[in-house]
Amino acid sequence: ATYNIKLITPEGTKEITCSDSEYILDAAEEKGLDLPYSCR
């Protein structure tokens, strides 16, 4: 399955697609988005 993800950031809204076997953070990084995280 593929999901449409809407990310609301201080810079604006971004939309990405993500498969059910992929982490949202990884999908965002592939699209060039720099999301804050501390879980890796």
UniProtKB/Swiss-Prot annotation:
Species this chain originates from: Pisum sativum
Subcellular location: Plastid, Chloroplast
Residue span(s) of domain 2Fe-2S ferredoxin-type: 3-40
Example of a GO MF term: 2 iron, 2 sulfur cluster binding
Taxonomy of the source species: Eukaryota, Viridiplantae, Streptophyta, Embryophyta, Tracheophyta
Family: Belongs to the 2Fe2S plant-type ferredoxin family.
Function: Ferredoxins are iron-sulfur proteins that transfer electrons in a wide variety of metabolic reactions.
CDD domains, A to Z: fer2
Gene Ontology cellular component terms for the protein in this record: chloroplast stroma
Binding positions ([2Fe-2S] cluster): 39
Cofactor: [2Fe-2S] cluster
Keywords associated with the record: 2Fe-2S, Chloroplast, Electron transport, Iron, Iron-sulfur, Metal-binding, Plastid, Transport
Pfam families named in the record: Fer2
Protein name: Ferredoxin-2
Co-factor note (free text): Binds 1 [2Fe-2S] cluster.
